[in-house]
Amino acid sequence: FKDEAEENAVRGAAYFQRAYRYYKLTHLFGDVPYLSQEIETPKVDFYTYDRWSILEQMEKDMEFAYQWVPEKVDRGKPSKWACGVLLMKVCMSLGHFDRAIEIGKEVVAANPLMTERFTTNKTKPNTNLMHDLHSVEAKMDMSNTEGILYVVSYPEVEGRDRINTMRNATPYWANGSIKTPDGKTGMSIVPASEAKGTELDNDANVGRGIGTCRPTNYYQYDIWTEKEKNDLRGVYNRDSWKGVFDLYYNAPALKGTEWYGKHPVKPVGMSVSDSIRCWFQWPHYKTFVPDPSVTTDRRGGETPWYIYRSAEVYLMLAECYYWKDMKQEAANMMNVVRQRAGAESLAASDINIGTVLDERARELYYEENRHVELSRISYVYALTGKACEVFGGHVYKLDNFSGPEGTSVNCKDAGVNFYFDWVSAKN
């Protein structure tokens, strides 16, 4: 190393990688083995460490990283600001909300939201700022100030891979279950030759989905209220979200019939199993990833993907203020994100943990590690003893976190931890 700064930058980047994984492990499994040094010989006697002690060590490590890792790094590497986001999450896990707020303010000041249209997509019809922000081009555009940490994958990069979101997140519209009202097969992957590249080309326009990642009703309906009528991220915006009812009957055999070129009508006799995978709506603006190398059976090509961006930091700031009972400040932070999207502003009286989680769902769909964040919030409720408004003022406790039978068994009863109650209510 040429100097202390270079050495500490490398050490800080390594600390990030370790803390990133332990942050997830401690919220997925609780107490886990902790490695403080490289394992150079076979070892079979690992023992778990207390999760709180691990998080305290991660906080120290990430304070070091936040000090020494540079602000400007190659795309895909952790920067000072990525270290700040992770440090903020660890601080929140430990109930250190004042420090988390201090860091969060620094991060968003250095990484402002993208509020104007950008990239070459900005002139495309039927698109908006959300399409720009989540396009392949935006994640490769160095003028994008909002992106903080990315998975890097694009053509000619070693280790690249296709994302397959158009396959997994799009309904299974081509499996033969979607029929015309008179019972004929309605949709085809390969349209008639004159329909290719037109609005009738469902494969080109949304991808050949198989519906393995269907949104729950919570994501499709519950979180989109009257206050989100003009939200660019939501189901009311039919450029941003698509449903099977936005596609077209395009089977070549239908040419000359009254249904050819019409929007699908949900078959009355469609089974529940078919409707689960074949008939739903999804956030097209996030999942549409064109692949120039294919001309049919489009699944979603190579693209970078956000791990951290400053919109999440605003929502983390809002959550910190919620824990501190500073509801107006929480609303202010959430409204920065909501106003950018076109949603109505929230008042202090609207704020509770449900409001925070709903906004995370709207903004961070397919980005946040939802299970991990719900687990973190569950631990914070038990750590702080704060009454949970969305569940009748219930107070959770650490000494009963996994249920009355002790910490070695799974929770099977409501009212034991927030995670169980939230998932039971929303899923």
Which positions does each model-derived feature cover?
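Long, intrinsically disordered, low-complexity segments
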Residues: 57, 93, 123-196, 284, ...
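Conserved, well-structured interaction surfaces
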Residues: 1-29, 45-52, 62-75, 287, ...
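An aromatic- and glycine-enriched ligand-binding surface/loop that stacks and positions planar moieties
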Residues: 91-260
